[in-house]
Amino acid sequence: KMPKHRIFTTEFSKVYPLYVQKAGRKNRTKDEVDQIIRWLTGYSQAGLEKQIKQQSDLETFFARAPAIHPNTSLIKGVVCGVRVEEIEDPLMRRIRYLDKLIDELANGKAMDKILR
């Protein structure tokens, strides 16, 4: 069995502030980041904050997500040199979907376009 990719065992609470910072550098807000995460995962704001507080790793964070949005298949493009829609591993694909949506936010895309 292959060892888990280290990103799977990374705490969500460690990557979350990086998303907020990335957005903030382009004058986008924490609220917008949270809205994107809630859209993708189905977490409520309270549920999202609980996952951060519990220091869940990314694997757990996505495993516990109440409802991965059905329109994730519409998220396309390249993150870290890889086409998100071609990523085989479902967990890695979800992590990269989130990266991609945050990139779109930081690149000035309108929220109604990001939340497909």
Which residue stretches match the model-derived regions?
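A charge-rich, low-complexity, intrinsically flexible signal that marks solvent-exposed coils, linkers
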Residues: M2-R116
